[in-house]
Amino acid sequence: GKDLTDVVSLIKTAKGDTVHLTIAREGEKDYLEFDVERSDVAVPTVAYKMLDDEIGYIAVSEFDKVTAERFKNALAKLEEQGMEKLIIDLRNNLGGVLDTCCEMLKQMLPKGLIVYTEDKYGQRTEYTCDGNNEFKKPLAVLVNGYSASAAEIFSGAIKDYGIGTLVGTKTYGKGIVQRIVGMEDGTAVKLTVSKYFTPNGTDIHKKGIEPDVTVELDESLKNKVTVTEEE
């Protein structure tokens, strides 16, 4: 048989191509046959809604390559609807792409440092914001113990600059940058290459970020709010 990498490469043909799949099921003699047209799969990572006449709500589930543009669009849509206050929900957001997080913070922060990383040799890399889109309305960021990595970069910068209030419980505490290195046999190794620090120089690894207001938030909030997903 083929390993997982080979199977995935067979399925990942050009957009618009048709792939014929034959599915064998354990305990079943008959095969299932499907013809599937390949297309881009859009995973919604940003959802938003006006909670009332003044309060906008944006839920960010992860920081992937399309999240920054969706976040920017959500902000613009809420502004058009008269938003005067904003809630950003990062609960259960396990992180994602560092550059995406920085692009989103460029829609929020004043001019200055967003985050910096240091490798084992002490080499420092800084990510900065020009402050052209500083968010100046009341802001709350919801976090919990499953807000990690890029979600902590985002919430840590908001807290350090004092432009918003963190509400919830202490975050996860993942303050390292990791890289996946592929091996010749198709496996991969995840290596830690550096640590990151908030604008004020705080190392949050294995410590997390304490919210400004500690409260056990109702996890059903997202289910109670009918949100609009950015396609």
Where are these regions (language model features)?
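Conserved functional hotspot residues or short segments at active or partner-binding sites
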Residues: D203-E231
